[in-house]
Swiss-Prot record:
CDD domains: Endonuclease_V (cd06559). The lineage of its organism: Bacteria, Bacillati, Chloroflexota, Chloroflexia, Chloroflexales. Mg(2+) binds at D43, D109. The gene is nfi. Belongs to the endonuclease V family. It comes from Roseiflexus sp. (strain RS-1). DNA repair enzyme involved in the repair of deaminated bases. Selectively cleaves double-stranded DNA at the second phosphodiester bond 3' to a deoxyinosine leaving behind the intact lesion on the nicked DNA. This is Endonuclease V. GO terms for biological process: DNA repair.
Length: 222
């Protein structure tokens, strides 16, 4: 991508909380995107005191791998639940800036609005890059939900403090749901459709599988 995302990062929880609260006011929760022809999976792994971010761009809807990038950054922010984007986003932004093909949509291995301050990494990255983004997480961070029916594509709302903050989505019968939430510029039901369009034989969408394999093992599954 012909773009740099350099910016100051917080040095305290108070600064980080203020940044999240500011970003929250800029999140667009309705569909505000053009045609989606490329979709990128985003994931981050750890090695010692550094974060290794991987971004894999796939054609949509064919899911052919078109481009990928990795970036390593030293972690300068402590591990605190709810603030992981400050550990991971700097490396992810470096990887995004290295891409030759700009994605039309980000699907992040993490949460968006389904977050204590409604600003998980999917929303954080979406607002900073102004790219449409979706959170698709393997585990729950906040909220409660009824079990979705054991049918591919079935989902139930994820509630937290009186709000619908996401969805528990059954991507395949007989497997645990994933947790989909708005990141930026994509409505919830649209986000669910995009995630399901990226699911093939596995519980996780191909975007997540590709980025996770690249971050963890240095290769993309075929």
């Amino acid at each position: 991508m012909d773009q740099s995302f350099d910016q100051p990062w917080p040095t305290s929880l108070a600064e980080a909380r203020a940044i999240q609260q500011h970003i929250r006011t800029r999140i667009i929760t309705h569909d505000a995107h053009g045609p989606i022809r490329t979709v990128a999976g985003v994931d981050t792994g750890y090695s010692g005191d550094s974060a290794l971010a991987a971004v894999v761009v796939l054609a949509f809807p064919s899911l052919e791998v078109l481009d990928y990038a990795v970036a390593r950054r030293q972690i300068d922010f402590p591990y605190v639940p709810g603030y992981l984007s400050f550990r991971e986003a700097p490396a992810v932004l470096d990887a995004l800036a290295s891409l030759r093909i700009a994605p039309d949509l980000l699907i992040c291995d993490g949460h968006g609005l389904a977050h204590p301050r409604r600003c998980g990494i999917a929303s954080h990255l979406g607002v900073l890059t102004d790219l449409p983004s979706i959170g698709c997480a393997k585990s729950l961070l906040v909220g409660t939900h009824e079990p979705p029916p054991d049918v591919r594509g079935a989902w139930t709302p994820l509630h937290d403090q009186g709000e619908v903050v996401g969805a528990a989505l059954r991507t395949r019968p007989g497997v645990r749901p994933v947790y989909v939430s708005i990141g930026h510029r994509v409505a919830l039901e649209t986000a669910i459709r995009f995630v399901m369009a990226c699911v093939t034989r596995y519980r996780l969408p191909e975007t997540t599988r590709a980025a996770d394999a690249l971050a963890s093992h240095g290769r993309i599954p075929r």
